Amino acid sequence: MASYKCPDCNYVYDESAGNVHEGFSPGTPWHLIPEDWCCPDCAVRDKLDFMLIESGVGEKGVTSTHTSPNLSEVSGTSLTAEAVVAPTSLEKLPSADVKGQDLYKTQPPRSDAQGGKAYLKWICITCGHIYDEALGDEAEGFTPGTRFEDIPDDWCCPDCGATKEDYVLYEEK
């Protein structure tokens, strides 16, 4: 039996052990795990991202199980081979030199102007992501000043997928 490892959190799925919590009895082979299954520890990586770390015949190696889809199989798009960017073209991109620059021209207020209540920071206990109430999170749709308690209960960590309940108050030292 083989073992497969999540490249983000190093969770290992061992076919011989299975994962009863996920509904896979011991001996469940990798090909019977649903394609939409994702890592039970970090919820970031899908099945196709896992790497084979040990095969059943005692050979050890790290091999990605990810395979790129054939462009002709991508439905509803007009992708051609010419549309795919070659990795070498990335080397020609200019780099931004931000070393020593003040990226925040003005510091965000550290307390609410109306109530005077200080803004707090919350940290994900799974990955260390910090949600700062003063800054909000524009990418997630939270404007600066959005209190953590005002974030919907079904919100998840943008970095690892952990639930809102996995955040604790962050105290700066």
UniProtKB/Swiss-Prot annotation:
The protein's required cofactors: Fe(3+)
Record keywords, A-Z: Cytoplasm, Electron transport, Iron, Metal-binding, Plasmid, Repeat, Transport
Compartment annotation: Cytoplasm
One Gene Ontology term from the biological process aspect of the record: alkane catabolic process
Family annotation (InterPro entries): Rubredoxin-like_dom, Rubredoxin_dom, Rubredoxin_ET, Rubredoxin_Fe_BS
Conditions for induction: Induced by AlkS and n-alkanes.
One Pfam family recorded for the sequence: Rubredoxin
Amino-acid positions noted as binding Fe cation 2 in the UniProt annotation, renumbered to this chain: 124, 127, 157, 160
Record-level GO cellular component terms: cytoplasm
Protein residues bound to Fe cation 1: 6, 9, 39, 42
Pathway per the UniProt entry: Hydrocarbon metabolism; alkane degradation
Record's keyword annotation contains Iron: yes
Disulfide-bonded cysteines: none
Domain Rubredoxin-like, chain residue ranges per copy: 2-53, 119-170
Cofactor note as given: Binds 2 Fe(3+) ions per subunit.
CDD domains recorded: rubredoxin
Main location: cytoplasm
PROSITE patterns in the cross-refs: RUBREDOXIN, RUBREDOXIN_LIKE
A GO term, aspect molecular function: electron transfer activity
Task performed by this protein: Involved in the hydrocarbon hydroxylating system, which transfers electrons from NADH to rubredoxin reductase and then through rubredoxin to alkane 1 monooxygenase.
Remaining remarks: Unlike other rubredoxins, this rubredoxin is unique in that it contains two binding sites for iron. It is most probably the product of a gene duplication event. The 2Fe form of the rubredoxin is a physiological form but it is less stable than the readily isolated 1Fe form. Both domains can form productive electron transfer complexes with rubredoxin reductase and accept electrons from the enzyme bound FAD.
Family as reported in the entry's similarity comment: Belongs to the rubredoxin family.
Protein name as annotated: Rubredoxin-2
Organism name: Ectopseudomonas oleovorans (Pseudomonas oleovorans)
